[in-house]
Amino acid sequence: MTTPEHGLTPTADAAGAVTQDDIDLAVATLRDLAGWHIWPVREETVTVDTTGDPTVFLPTLRLLDVRSVIADNTEVPLDNIEWSESGMLRLKTRPRKGFRRITATILHGFETTPLAAVAMQMAARAHQPATNMQVGGISVGAPGALTPYSSEWRLLDRYKLGPMP
């Protein structure tokens, strides 16, 4: 069996029958909720909109390196940009305002994260029935086992992207 890029696989001691599909779905759920892949470190090419401001926000919270930047189909010399670990680029030349104006090839992500354990916990719950609580005529509860618990949401919130311009 090939190890998936997120590095998580079922273990023999896992409670219940956790499958690779369960794990992959839990990881995909966390990534969708966060707005980016989170882990592991990987090179990726991303395309973003710009407001015309020289500061451009990339979809990451851990930028390790900027390999290339293209603005309006023109490569930007790397010495014409500054970047922060939180995913911001500052271009010396103001880009034009518009959709899909900036494409950057970046190295980003975390080597490890506590969210890997959250993904495994979510995968272990994948086949459990949804839990509901009813008081009178009102019923509340999680719609399915792949919904993070409140403690897991608090951890996930540390890795979620904010609103993008």
Where are the regions that the model predicts?
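Divalent metal-cofactor coordination and adjacent catalytic microenvironments
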Residues: 1-165
